[in-house]
Amino acid sequence: MNKELSGVWKKQEIITFNLPELDSLKGYDLFINLRNTNDYKFNNLHLIVAMNFPYGKIVTDTLEYKMAKPDGTWLGNGISDVKENKLWYKENVTFSEKGIYKVSISHAMRNNGDVTGVKNLDGIIDVG
């Protein structure tokens, strides 16, 4: 369920996907998969993730993830300049409402001291 990007994640580009039908009695750990290249200029990542429930409830989370060690070494897996990160989103979630759950992800990155957000986030090649 990953959405491929062209190496740039535009501020207005909201990545949306529907979750598959899941067992309503089982708890699920949810992750966001993200791949970045050396063109990514930040050591962290801020995301806004919204989950729309079938009966209309919306839960929105603002999340921050560490993307690099203090020395600049990328976190994640991969031997080339592409690193794959499995980012925690929610733990032990149950899906008790019958119907389609929709997840929307957008980035909320800013440069230090800048009030306006980064319009084009370079170095992100897919999210899901």
Listing of model-derived features with the role each one plays in the protein:
Residues 47-48, 52, 112-128:
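Exposed low-complexity, polar/acidic, P/S/T/G-rich flexible segments that act as propeptides
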Residues 8-11, 24, 94-100, 107, ...:
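Long, compositionally biased, intrinsically disordered segments
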Residues 3-7, 17-20, 72-76, 90-94:
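Beta-strand-rich interaction surfaces with strong enrichment in secreted/lumenal proteins
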Residues 65-67, 75-92:
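A beta-strand/beta-hairpin structural motif
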Residues 30-34, 101-107:
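Extracellular beta-strand-rich recognition modules
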Residues 1-50, 56:
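Start-of-domain marker
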Residues 36-39, 84-89, 93-96, 106-120:
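Short acidic/polar inter-strand loop motif in beta-rich domains
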Residues 3, 61-69:
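Solvent-exposed serine/threonine-rich low-complexity stretches and specific carbohydrate-binding patches
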